[in-house]
Amino acid sequence: MRPPADPGARRRATHGRGLSAEGLALLVLMLKGYRPLARRFAAAGGEIDLIVRRGRTIAFVEVKARATLDAAATAIDARKRARVSRAARAWLARHPLAAGATLRADAVFVAPRRWPRHLPNAFEIEGL
């Protein structure tokens, strides 16, 4: 299938695939016992796709959808890690009751016709 010629249409299609991947990632995490706290949290020049909790652990989750799971796994670069870290710090500032929780940055990699791969502690949250 050819991508749409209109850049706006391409952007909307990519956005739609991202939302679908985030929904699938959330379903997988819920099956593992996590409960959602926030979706698409944006603040302080950063964004977090999912924020979930299981017990005393809060995970800030980056979801990456690519053609293969390996391609998705390599898609979280230093710039993206910094943006997630900034947003995580902003979320924590707004939710002081989370102060005693174990915090981590997870990733979920999504590819067509594959079960999503959840990677706990995918990277360090800078500044915590």
Curated annotation (Swiss-Prot):
Task: Provide any one GO MF term from the record.
Answer: nucleic acid binding
Q: Which family does it belong to?
A: Belongs to the UPF0102 family.
Checking NCBIfam families in the record gives: PRK12497.1-5, PRK14679.1
Q: Which PANTHER family match?
A: UPF0102 PROTEIN YRAN
What name goes with this protein?
UPF0102 protein Mext_0406
